[in-house]
């Protein structure tokens, strides 16, 4: 199935397909893959991160569906 993957800030250099940048990229993944499994597959499991699917916070055990947009951010702090 196909999803969109968007990596932000320093994580954008870790796209599994072609280059870096802020634009979401299409990505073929196995049916029923979870957020956590995909994060591990693309080598970000050890990174501290915040994940969103279709604009909502997503736990690692959430299964992805065709057309979902997975966005991964590094931790953000400010004041």
Q: Language-model segments: which ranges?
A:
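Ubiquitin-like/PB1-type beta-grasp interaction modules and other compact soluble beta-rich domains
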Residues: 1-78
């Amino acid at each position: 199935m196909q999803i969109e993957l968007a990596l932000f800030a320093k994580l954008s250099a870790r796209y599994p397909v072609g280059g870096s940048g802020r634009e979401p990229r299409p990505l073929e993944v196995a049916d029923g893959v979870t957020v956590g499994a995909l994060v591990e597959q693309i080598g970000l499991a050890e990174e501290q991160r915040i994940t969103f699917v279709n604009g909502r916070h997503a736990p690692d055990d959430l299964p992805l569906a065709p057309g979902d947009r997975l966005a991964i951010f590094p931790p953000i702090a400010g004041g």
